[in-house]
Amino acid sequence: MQRNNFTEVIEFVFLGFSSFGKHQITLFVVFLTIYILTLAGNIIIVTITHIDHHLHTPMYFFLSMLASSETVYTLVIVPRMLSSLIFYNLPISLAGCATQMFFFVTLATNNCFLLTAMGYDRYVAICNPLRYTIIMSKGMCALLVCGSLGTGLVMAVLHVPAMFHLPFCGTVVEHFFCDIYPVMKLSCVDTTVNEIINYGVSSFVILVPIGLIFISYVLIVSSILKIVSTEGQKKAFATCASHLTVVIVHYGCASIAYLKPKSESSVEKDLLLSVTYTIITPLLNPVVYSLRNKEVKDALCRAVGRNTS
């Protein structure tokens, strides 16, 4: 592709929440508060699952991996977004934008497949309890985690170099971070191939995990309904409730954001959706798993009691 006919763009500026005018300071305070709570919550989960031997199980291993991934995920996006709310027209270099997008795609994909691994873990625990420790061995858990991260890296390698091989004419990104579509819109040339790659990657990353999780929960519900005691059914449902809550919010927002027709896109709606899956969902994980999960709450109490004694 020839670049000689285009002025070389070396940096971008985020439009972000500039349309909110005077409310940007309020947004800064709100987002900063959520960011601090998200980091604190996820770090607490990682720490608790590491130090409390009662939580040394596959379920909490996956939870700690998800919390770690969500921590880095927010570090990649939120600090830059907060800076843009305070310092207007703060530029980001082309290399910086590519780096942010690479980590975003990698970690977003990793999170999707980690949630799938957690769904599989719940399926094995409920449908094959006698073989649970054999199936969900340390090797299998490591394989699922590495597979999730590896898939994320492959998706990023497919996506990001193809995106930044394009020549850009515009410099104003109608977003608060280097997301795929807003950056693609700045290209001077036809982006049909890139759009096909993006839609293919998005469909794979969203629909494959949704399908696998759906199958897992169909089998889980089928097994739960066979449990004779009502108490046993309640306990089984309770173990899945936290995961299912996070899955619905996570994939619901991601599906609307990346699989909707281009004709239905608008800057305001896209910003709102992006806030949900980049800021709200990472906070949802520690809140849901700590408030709804008795084992995590007990582990927190033990840790607090140990430190105060």
Curated annotation (Swiss-Prot):
It holds the Pfam family 7tm_4. Residues 1-27, 79-84, 153-203, 257-270 are extracellular. One of its GO terms (cellular component) is endoplasmic reticulum membrane. GO terms for biological process: angiogenesis; chemotaxis; G protein-coupled receptor signaling pathway; G protein-coupled receptor signaling pathway, coupled to cyclic nucleotide second messenger; lipid homeostasis; muscle organ development; regulation of angiogenesis; regulation of muscle cell differentiation. It is a multi-pass membrane protein. Keywords: Angiogenesis, Cell membrane, Chemotaxis, Disulfide bond, G-protein coupled receptor, Membrane, Myogenesis, Olfaction, Receptor, Sensory transduction, Transducer, Transmembrane, Transmembrane helix. InterPro entries: GPCR_Rhodpsn, GPCR_Rhodpsn_7TM, Olfact_rcpt. The keyword Cell membrane applies. Expressed in the olfactory epithelium as well as in the testis. Expressed in round spermatids during stages VI-VIII of spermatogenesis. It comes from the Eukaryota. CDD domains: 7tmA_OR10A-like. Disulfide bonds join 97-178. It is found in: Cell membrane. Its main location: membrane. Belongs to the G-protein coupled receptor 1 family. This is Olfactory receptor 10J5.
